[in-house]
Design a protein with these regions (language model features):
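Catalytic cores and adjacent flexible loops of soluble metabolic enzymes
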Residues: 1-274
Length: 274
């Protein structure tokens, strides 16, 4: 059965009450995991490519996020350890598994003491081998996104984890927001299966334009985990609204993901997509 991750990302806007409502809504929708990001603004580093950004043929290839502007924005979204523990308690209350993305080596020790079920590595850290090694030494489950990563880097990460005898999941990911279906490259899922038994997808397609089509197609390619950004706010009230599903869309995804493969294929044949 395919597992669903509701990614709160920055959609909680640093508001504990909003975060609480989001966890409750995600649980009601039937997800398996709810995820936050343990990002701290003071851990940010200046990266020249984010100062400029890159847009080609009206598609955002590199998000423009200048350091100072991003620092001032993220500072309002910082989650203290107390707030992260509150998030975990909410997940336990609503019977979903708490999960977080870890960005910094110096945060691993303190986060490992909290009752997160799973740690995630963001796409741009798939080749951060020291971070990977240290996370592998924890007892948390490990999921790694692979967007924008070279095959040699994916292979190196897999080899490190296998040497450490750490089970892990790779998520196929296209770091274009939103991801056009023609850019989805789902064959990559088959490639990732060569490195680990469990693979999935971090779906950044547009819910308004494409519904759950990309996530469901990924299941046909063998995805066992689907991650989607989630919001309960209007799309224009959150930075990630364009790639975030709302409650009804998330609930539909959970329901559709439980269909058998034959039913999913029939759904695509009606749309002449499979």
């Amino acid at each position: 059965m395919t597992k669903i991750i509701a990614e709160l990302c920055q959609n909680h806007n640093g508001d504990k009450n909003l975060m609480s409502d989001m966890v409750a809504a995600a649980a009601e929708a039937g997800v398996d995991y709810v995820k936050i990001q343990s990002m701290q603004s003071k851990d940010l580093t200046k990266r020249p490519r984010f100062e400029r950004g890159l847009i080609e043929s009206d598609i955002t290839k590199v998000i423009k996020r200048p350091f100072r502007t991003e620092y001032n924005r993220l500072r309002k979204l910082d989650l203290s350890l107390e707030n992260q523990n509150y998030f975990i308690e909410l997940c336990i209350k609503y019977k979903v598994k708490p999960m977080t993305t870890v960005f910094s080596l110096n945060r691993i020790k303190e986060l490992d003491k909290l009752n997160f079920d799973t740690f995630k590595v963001a796409s741009f850290d798939c080749s951060s081998y020291k971070l990977i090694e240290q996370l592998a030494k924890t007892k948390k489950n490990l999921i790694i996104s692979t967007g924008g990563t070279y095959l040699r880097e994916i292979k190196e990460t897999a080899e490190i984890l296998k040497k450490l005898k750490k089970k892990f999941t790779f998520l196929h990911c296209i770091s274009i927001y939103p991801t056009p279906l023609k850019e989805a490259n789902l064959n990559r899922i088959e490639l990732l299966k060569k490195f680990t038994k469990t693979v999935g997808i971090s779906d950044h397609s547009s819910p308004e334009k494409n519904g759950n089509d990309l996530s469901l197609a990924a299941i046909l390619y063998g995805a066992k985990i689907i991650e989607r950004h989630f919001t309960i706010l209007k799309k224009d009230k959150t930075r990630d609204g364009v790639v975030s599903v709302n409650f009804n869309q998330l609930k539909t995804l959970v329901s559709q993901s439980k269909e058998n493969i034959i039913s999913i294929k029939k759904r695509f044949k009606k749309k002449k997509m499979y």
